[in-house]
Amino acid sequence: MTYKDNKILEDKKKNIVLFYPYISKKSSKLLKNRLNTRWVGQGPMVDKFENEFSKKFLEKKKCIATGSGTDALHLAYLLAGIKKNDEVLVPVFTCTATNIPLLYIGAKIRFIDINPKTMNICVEDLKKKVSSKTKAIVCVHYGGNMCDMEEIVKIASKYKIKVIEDAAQALGGKYLKKKVGTISDFTAFSFQAIKHITTGDGGLLAFKNQRLYQKAKRLRWFGIDRKKKQLGVWENDVKEIGYKYQLTDLGASIGYQGLLDFKKILSHRIKINEIYLKNLSKNPNIICIHDHDRKK
């Protein structure tokens, strides 16, 4: 993608284009290379993508790339130990993708109201509804505006329950100088077309407990250790029911250059946000969402 004539918002006379997926010209070279190797499924390019993401956003902690952000959330819920009939607290304002994996499991979703100033989970309502029945809290950082993680983590610690962040819209975000993906038990990211970077479609799961890494990899691919299989080990010890949730090398090739160009991508989005805030704030009929001072 190129930003035509350095215009921040391209005027289409009738409509302003909502977004363009960021796909670097350099990605085509990586894609061509993958096609020439004929390694188009999950392979070394996915490993390279995960390593670069970990280095840039997760303080070098291990993570797993998935076929979608929804896949990443489903794995997070499973790794958090959520089972059928478990109560999970979720913000009422979110994409259906946050909740659908909970329905796969058969969990009981209990909605928490949102703070109208941020569109994020309302901590006061969370305090009213959390109980000994609660298994986990899911929070969504709407529009890159970080939730009040200090309070949410404090509540979760009191009840000894897990916190799962849906950070589909918050790549590169920080809370009290901590990067999103390093704060809670689990954090799910999305690389769908409209996100900060795209892999065509894809996602990624980060987790605090690094001992879950091997299990997460198995759950991502039929409950099998895929690396051992690739090395020619024909005995497959299937330890649990797994899924087919892996990212492909083709998707990773598209997204890898986006990781390298992330600073430029984020800067461009911030400029667009500033234009909207500056102009829409003048309209008394429109309420604009602003970042909290402690959040970035």
What are these regions (language model features)?
Residues 102, 156, 280-281:
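A generic structural signal for well-ordered alpha-helical segments
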Residues 1-40, 237-239:
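N-terminal "arm"/small-domain region of PLP-dependent enzymes with the aminotransferase-like
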Residues 6, 15, 21, 46-51, ...:
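PLP-dependent aminotransferase class I/II
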Residues 64, 89, 110, 162-164, ...:
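Structural detector of well-ordered beta-strand residues that form the stable sheet scaffold
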Residues 117-199, 204-212:
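Active-site phosphate-binding strand-loop segment of PLP-dependent enzymes
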Residues 39-87, 101-105, 111-113, 178:
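Phosphate-binding glycine-rich loop
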Residues 93-99:
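Conserved coil-to-alpha-helix start sites within the AMP-binding
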